[in-house]
């Protein structure tokens, strides 16, 4: 069992055969060691009881019913009497039946078997460590060919071949003869090596530190050579350098985690606890079994057949032995990852068997569906919509979701304020949706953050905390600036909301997970809260204005009154006299009174100390008044000057959208400057 206080993380990796044996074996009170599964049977067809030493054996995995052995005897669990704690007839311990959820078994393989994840998955770890092509290793694993291994200094059959100056044409047919004769085991153990055993020997002979040193030397040599001028050769060099880097990283990982490379070849195959691969009886007396049970049975059948060939019959042809070893390897491959070598194995109904990899990987796998994606209390889910009026650290929760999430807190508040005598009365008030309920709910939400999560959670910004506020409707309102961290948009995306309960969780949510504290990407440090999608379109509409220039609009800056008068030219062009405003407040007030539009051009009086004049720009028109004053009209501004060429005032041509955007930027800069001054 995993203690959640002692174990804070879960890691999947390689383990030694000794560790597998320690997990799966146990010593029963009579001193007998059990744990090895030797029979491919599950339940007896007459008694419906688990077969001894089978895949559901009660001696190995524990009793089906707590305190009841296979014989039917009953003992009280935890009784301190001198009664034996196991049945002497069947050897089953009197323990809790929950042990069948975590007690493992093992299959002792007659021949070594490579772990298909480390051989066939890309990149192939075995091929990287051995620095050999994957196809060559596959041919060796599946007994398609062998390689010589003269392990002694004495003359051997294969060494004699090199002592001749010429080679007889029929020499290549002489070695296969040994595969069909008696004494093949002696020849094989002395002369050749094939199958997963050959891979295991090569991995066991590796020195990881020497691999790192040699790979680093070769990488430096390739880097010093420089480009050859041949594009094909340069690509080969780049690929080789990338391979050397991966090989060094893999070797360093093995050293850092104290993993031996030969552990990628299995000698003991773990058997999952029975409760994780159940057989269930449904209506009509039919049985439904997990596919993993059938795959385990296939492995045991083939492994027992190989054992019989090597032990009971001494005259078994070597080709038959190698063929059976290949079948064992393929059976284990199918158990671990069905279909990784091509066509998947199917049952009698042409249905693909669900292997161990299929059980744990993907959206419906054990981790994502049962562990990471399981339903939890104090959580809800809804569609997200944009909340432009929200602060960056706030989110809008629908009343229907909020009252369910904070119901226990509201009940406590009602009882503390003596508005309800007990929990039942408080729940009835919540169902009736009395006004006092919403008041207490708002008080509770003010001091309690919530966590928003959007699947898939690929980095830590996939879960952020917000200060909730009540909103109408049934959707969660979210500030558009936080969407990039969630990789969310408002086209129907859903997000989950969670309530942190413990003080530690609330402190972490406030100090580390608030959205306004996660403005930079944790990976590269770039700003993560930047305008995207809807905000960019809104800013474009806000600041676009009309495309008509000053030449298309014959302005008369002297006529600053009655700017709503309109006249239509012969070209059906609607011309509006553009108004003048002394400050931005008057312009925004006119927009709110619907006297002008958001993109209507206007003239805004500007401060004289802010330069808007380009050095080489010349006026488009100059209008003179009777008193000698004149107006220089440019493309986007005009200047009022006196007879002495003194500047009276400056007007810039802009829109209400530009003014609003400028004021927001100005307030943000002023607030940032004040914050910096307080810090200093």
Curated annotation (Swiss-Prot):
Binding site for Zn(2+): 69, 71, 87, 90
Cofactor note: Binds 1 Mg(2+) ion per subunit. Binds 1 Zn(2+) ion per subunit.
GO molecular function, a single term: magnesium ion binding
Keywords in alphabetical order: Chloroplast, DNA-directed RNA polymerase, Magnesium, Metal-binding, Nucleotidyltransferase, Plastid, Transcription, Transferase, Zinc
Catalytic activity: RNA(n) + a ribonucleoside 5'-triphosphate = RNA(n+1) + diphosphate
GO cellular component: chloroplast; DNA-directed RNA polymerase complex; mitochondrion
Intracellular or extracellular location(s): Plastid, Chloroplast
Pfam families xref list: RNA_pol_Rpb1_1, RNA_pol_Rpb1_2
EC number of the protein: 2.7.7.6
Cofactor: Mg(2+); Zn(2+)
Residues bound to Mg(2+): 489, 491, 493
GO biological process: one example: DNA-templated transcription
Family the UniProt entry places it in: Belongs to the RNA polymerase beta' chain family. RpoC1 subfamily.
Subunit record text: In plastids the minimal PEP RNA polymerase catalytic core is composed of four subunits: alpha, beta, beta', and beta''. When a (nuclear-encoded) sigma factor is associated with the core the holoenzyme is formed, which can initiate transcription.
Role of this protein: DNA-dependent RNA polymerase catalyzes the transcription of DNA into RNA using the four ribonucleoside triphosphates as substrates.
Name of the protein this chain belongs to: DNA-directed RNA polymerase subunit beta'
Gene name per UniProt: rpoC1
